[in-house]
C-alpha cells in the first residue's frame, strides 16, 4: 500500500522492533501525528481468545475519565416518565413507534448511541437487521437496555465507550483526540485496558493480551509491551 511522504517521515520515528511502554507509545503517537485536523488516538488490542466460542467473548463498556472528544448523539426509545427523564438528561432523540418507523422506512441511523427501556425491546427488536451491523442495537450487557435512562444518557455523553471483539479477536477503541495531550490520553488508555482485563472470560487460557498497538487516525502503529500493558 502506497503511503504519502508525511506518513513515511512519521513512520521513521517508530522502531518497529521495539515494544514501548504506554507513556512512550502515546508520546510517540502524538509526535507522529501530522494531519491538519485533530486526529483520534486509537488503541487496538489483540486477545488470546477464540471469538467463535460463546464462552470466550469479550465485551463491555467503560466511561473514559477524559471523554472521547467527540460529540455523541444519543437516541432513546422510551415512553411517559422515562421519555421525560431521557430528554432532561440531554438525549438528542426520544420516542417510540415514530422513531422505529423512521429507522425502518428511511434507514435513518443518524445517531451514535441507542438506549431503550426493557419494555420497548419488543418494538426495537424489529430493527435488529438495521441497528445490529452498525453496533447500535441496545443490549443489557452494554448498559443500553435499562430503566435508568438518565444515567445511561449522561454516561454516553460523558465519554462511555463500548468495546467488543471483532472476528479476528481484536478490540478497536478510541481513547481521545491528539489535542488532549499525553496525560489525559494515558489516563483514558489505562482505564480502557483495566476494563478489558476485568472482562477476561473464565475460558481464556494463558497470556490474555497478545498485542497492543496505538495509533492516530493517519499515523503509524506503535506497539506496546503486552506483558506490561499498564
From Swiss-Prot:
The keyword S-adenosyl-L-methionine does not apply. GO terms for molecular function: rRNA binding; structural constituent of ribosome; tRNA binding. The keyword Mitochondrion does not apply. One of its GO terms (cellular component) is large ribosomal subunit. Pfam families: Ribosomal_L1. Transmembrane segments: none annotated. Keywords: Repressor, Ribonucleoprotein, Ribosomal protein, RNA-binding, rRNA-binding, Translation regulation, tRNA-binding. InterPro entries: Ribosom_uL1_bac-type, Ribosomal_uL1, Ribosomal_uL1-like, Ribosomal_uL1/biogenesis, Ribosomal_uL1_3-a/b-sand, Ribosomal_uL1_CS. GO terms for biological process: regulation of translation; translation. Binds directly to 23S rRNA. The L1 stalk is quite mobile in the ribosome, and is involved in E site tRNA release. Protein L1 is also a translational repressor protein, it controls the translation of the L11 operon by binding to its mRNA. Part of the 50S ribosomal subunit. Belongs to the universal ribosomal protein uL1 family. This is Large ribosomal subunit protein uL1. The gene is rplA.
